């Protein structure tokens, strides 16, 4: 466990520079955080940025304090299984915050972990910018009061979140959804499309957490087998999340005639090339929607996690696409419904039923409109620099 985290030696810290720490606990946060780091260092090359995240933050230029790849979990029982890792990371990062003389702490999503860090930062007078806020509109709305006490400013990615935080007295700004920033940099890469052109292509996105992959990928593979029998020309592409090891995928993949190609680091290219996607619930549903691809949402957690979630969650849908739309735009297969036969049936309906597919595409266009305009990372970076200037 200890090798997952690396505390920077205090004596080697950057001196004479403004210092920012950015904390991202999951693959999506690592991605969006990396864009903020790039914008920050472009706008102010004199900044020194520390990071808690994974490979993308590192590549963007952050000096890594801890690797978050072992922290990402989904569900109540999964949290208990990783509690040792979470606590080890928390104590090390807290210690760093207390000693480092940060000018600003930027927190990205990952609320239970990050709100604890926020309290530690409050104790040493480090201002906090929260980017991609906790989904208080879905569950545990009482966290709004905690956020209002601990966070100086919040950058939200859904327009309907503004009123929630304003009513709590928070300084809040809608910056647009960060996924919109990714379109221009990915649309020109046609390698996968040229490779697969002419065949029905289905993207399989089983999630960015090991637990998700373990529960969903076997059912997606079973669906692929059924679809191959129904559509002999069908092909499948599985973009691998950076937080998932290839060994975790290989044990679930068939070694027979089902044509599943695994690619690394090309999620958006894979989605652009695909005719549709089977997607684990979460941010990936919005990625798929922004790229205008029909989808089937599959969702599985432990029975206890699901039971607790259903008792606490206040929204009607699991998928962010449907939540943003305020209605059912794409099908959701939850728990026992997320099995190969049902997934295959929904995929076939999208492929074969043109009116149904067109109606879904219209709904996805509405969702994209509600997500704002590109430039979220730049806006967040400018907010951060303004907060540092105001701090003095």
Predicted feature descriptions by range:
Residues 3-4, 9-392:
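Nucleotide-activated sugar donor-binding and catalytic core shared by glycosyltransferases
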């Amino acid at each position: 466990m200890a090798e997952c985290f690396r505390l920077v030696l205090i004596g080697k810290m950057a001196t004479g520079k403004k210092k920012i720490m950015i904390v991202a606990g999951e693959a999506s946060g690592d991605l969006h955080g990396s864009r903020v780091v790039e914008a920050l260092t472009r706008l102010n090359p004199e900044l020194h940025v520390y990071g808690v995240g994974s490979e993308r933050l590192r590549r963007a230029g952050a000096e890594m304090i801890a690797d978050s790849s072992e922290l990402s979990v989904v569900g109540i029982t999964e949290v208990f299984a990783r509690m040792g890792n979470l606590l080890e990371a928390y104590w090390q990062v807290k210690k760093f915050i207390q000693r480092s003389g940060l000018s600003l702490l930027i927190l990205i999503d990952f609320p239970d972990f990050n709100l604890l860090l926020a309290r530690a930062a409050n104790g040493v007078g480090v201002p906090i910018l929260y980017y991609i806020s906790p989904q208080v509109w879905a569950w545990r709305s009482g966290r709004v009061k905690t956020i209002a006490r601990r966070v100086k400013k919040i950058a939200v990615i859904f327009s309907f979140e503004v009123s929630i935080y304003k009513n709590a007295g928070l300084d809040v700004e809608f910056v647009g959804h960060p996924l919109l920033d990714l379109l221009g940099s990915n649309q020109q890469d046609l390698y996968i499309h040229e490779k697969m052109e002419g065949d029905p292509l289905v993207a399989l996105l089983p999630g960015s957490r090991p637990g998700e992959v373990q529960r969903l990928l076997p059912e997606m593979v079973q669906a692929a087998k059924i679809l191959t029998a129904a559509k002999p020309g069908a092909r499948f592409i599985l973009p691998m999340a950076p937080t998932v090891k290839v060994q975790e995928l290989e044990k679930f993949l068939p070694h027979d005639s089902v044509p599943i190609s695994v690619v690394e680091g090309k999620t958006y290219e894979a989605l652009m090339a695909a005719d549709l996607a089977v997607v684990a619930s979460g941010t990936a549903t919005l990625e798929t929607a922004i790229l205008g691809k029909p989808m089937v949402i599959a969702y599985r957690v432990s029975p206890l996690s699901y039971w607790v979630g259903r008792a606490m969650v206040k929204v009607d849908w699991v998928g962010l696409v449907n939540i943003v739309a305020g209605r059912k735009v794409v099908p959701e297969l939850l728990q026992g419904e997320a099995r190969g036969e049902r997934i295959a049936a929904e995929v076939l309906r999208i492929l074969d039923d043109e009116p149904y597919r067109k109606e879904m595409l219209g709904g996805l266009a509405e969702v994209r409109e509600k997500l704002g305009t590109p430039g979220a990372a730049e806006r967040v970076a400018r907010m951060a620099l303004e907060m540092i200037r105001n701090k003095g």
